[in-house]
């Protein structure tokens, strides 16, 4: 299992990035969470097989249709609880 903490910047709020992330992650069977941050970024944690986490990280680099991703910062982290949730904004 692999777990990664992600911070995505660019035009990623107000474009359904959180909802898209939740759907993509759940569809891949990943555990973790996603939330908007007050600085305009989106933060997430993904945990699952190396293959599925890598595919999710690649997908995050483009995001949903209306998003414009500028940068993604990915760092290893501790595994989250089971399931995938959309957390309230920070």
Give residue ranges: language-model regions.
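Intrinsically disordered, low-complexity, mixed-charge
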Residues: 1-90
């Amino acid at each position: 299992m692999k777990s990664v903490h992600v911070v995505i910047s660019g035009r990623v709020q107000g474009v359904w990035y959180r909802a898209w992330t939740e759907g993509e992650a759940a569809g891949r069977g990943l555990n973790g969470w996603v939330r908007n941050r007050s600085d305009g970024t989106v933060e997430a944690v993904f945990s699952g097989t190396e293959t599925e986490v890598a595919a999710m990280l690649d997908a995050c680099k483009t995001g949903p249709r209306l998003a414009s991703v500028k940068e993604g910062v990915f760092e290893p982290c501790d595994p989250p609880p089971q399931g995938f949730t959309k957390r309230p904004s920070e």
